Swiss-Prot record:
Species annotation: Marinobacter nauticus (strain ATCC 700491 / DSM 11845 / VT8) (Marinobacter aquaeolei)
Record localization: Cytoplasm
Gene name of this polypeptide: recA
The protein, known as: Protein RecA
UniProt keyword Transport present: no
InterPro entries per UniProt: AAA+_ATPase (IPR003593), DNA_recomb/repair_RecA (IPR013765), DNA_recomb/repair_RecA_CS (IPR020584), P-loop_NTPase (IPR027417), RecA-like_C (IPR049261), RecA-like_N (IPR049428), RecA_ATP-bd (IPR020588), RecA_C_sf (IPR023400)
Cellular component, GO annotation: cytosol
Molecular function, one GO term: ATP-dependent DNA damage sensor activity
Pfam families named among the record's database cross-references: RecA, RecA_C
Gene Ontology process terms (BP): DNA recombination; DNA repair; SOS response
The protein's role, per its UniProt record: Can catalyze the hydrolysis of ATP in the presence of single-stranded DNA, the ATP-dependent uptake of single-stranded DNA by duplex DNA, and the ATP-dependent hybridization of homologous single-stranded DNAs. It interacts with LexA causing its activation and leading to its autocatalytic cleavage.
Length: 347
């Protein structure tokens, strides 16, 4: 009976391959287990919280939060990090609010960045889909879902009712995009805004725009919030920011990271390296003094960060140690099978 079942399965698989091409159905163990490729977010704490060292290529990601919480800044940092890897990036600016001067300050190579400012939501998503299908773009940012206005709404009158139009548009687009994004190994990030549900008595009244489709299709969802101000004397020079990983299909979810976003500079990376170095025991802190490998690197956090900025090799060394300690290492199938093969050869 078992032989008959195996023969039937073999016949079905060969027929599927003939009809749909090689690789249409395969055993999961046939492919080598590899770490999911990712691009850094520019924040060490967030890279660790995501579990794979950043945002995953070949997946859809949603970043949402209140106004002025750092959503666009975070995505521009992702573009800057991807460009350092030699990747091609595109920014679909549906809000028509991208500032090239600010983007350049965050490390984005604006000369190489593809930018589109579409008129309608349909046009924006069609452009994004064509870029994905070209297999030549590695990171696409859509800013934002709330600004993807359906054509019927733009051509209609101000008071016209267009219930559910945007949700239907997003649902249809994501059905097309999700497979293409995977095949092209492209990271697609949707920025989203928050709205309040009316009449909610229990639970959070907050919801994101564009219906529920994006919540399902996203492999990673990040909730970004401003939790305080960074001050230099009486002057506010930045935001204290908290990011929660509310959904994660590539690593355990519900972790969070806190970091500073400095005005005109972006994520304060050195402060994170220093804080996490102290937390993991790679940097010694005695009173106000910080020391690394027995050598004092500064009195007070500001001086220690300045030292790390001037000595990037030491900063990179501390960061590498933190990543090595906190990032999970994938178990390769080949290494697990190697001893058995060796024993077979000896026999």
């Amino acid at each position: 009976m078992e032989d008959n079942r195996k023969k039937a399965l073999g016949a079905a698989l060969s027929q599927i391959e003939r009809q749909f091409g090689k690789g249409a159905v395969m055993k999961m163990g046939d492919q080598p287990r590899e770490a999911i490729p990712a691009v850094s977010t520019g924040s060490l704490g967030l890279d660790v919280a995501l579990g794979i060292g950043g945002l995953p290529y070949g997946r859809i990601v949603e970043i949402y939060g209140p106004e002025s919480s750092g959503k666009t800044t975070l995505t521009l940092q992702v573009i800057a990090e991807a460009q350092k890897q030699g990747k091609t990036c595109a920014f679909v600016d549906a809000e028509h609010a991208l500032d090239p001067v600010y983007a350049e300050k965050l490390g984005v190579n604006v000369d190489e960045l593809l930018v589109s400012q579409p008129d309608t939501g349909e046009q924006a998503l069609e452009i994004a889909d064509m870029l994905v299908r070209s297999n030549a773009v590695d990171v696409i940012i859509v800013d934002s879902v709330a600004a993807l206005t359906p054509k019927a709404e733009i051509e209609g009158e101000m008071g016209d009712s267009h219930v559910g139009l945007q949700a239907r548009l997003m649902s249809q687009a994501l059905r097309k995009l999700t497979g293409n994004v995977k095949h092209a190994n492209c990271l697609m990030v949707f920025i989203n805004q928050i709205r309040m549900k009316i009449g909610v008595m229990f639970g959070s009244p907050e919801t994101t725009t564009g219906g529920n489709a994006l919540k399902f299709y996203s492999s990673v969802r990040l909730d970004i919030r401003r939790i305080g101000s960074v001050k230099d004397g009486d002057e506010v020079v930045g935001n204290e920011t908290r990011v929660k990983v509310v959904k994660n299909k590539v690593s355990p979810p519900f972790r969070q990271a806190e970091f500073q976003i400095m005005y005109g500079k972006g994520i304060y990376h050195m402060a994170e390296v220093l804080d996490m170095g102290v937390k993991e025991g790679f940097v010694d802190k005695s009173g106000a003094w910080y020391a690394y490998n027995g050598d004092k690197i500064g009195q007070g956090k500001a001086n220690a960060c300045k030292f790390l900025e001037e000595n990037l090799d030491i900063a990179n060394e501390i960061e590498a140690k933190v990543r090595d300690k906190l990032m999970p290492k994938p178990v390769k199938k080949e290494t697990a099978e190697a001893p058995a093969e060796a024993n077979g050869e000896l026999l």
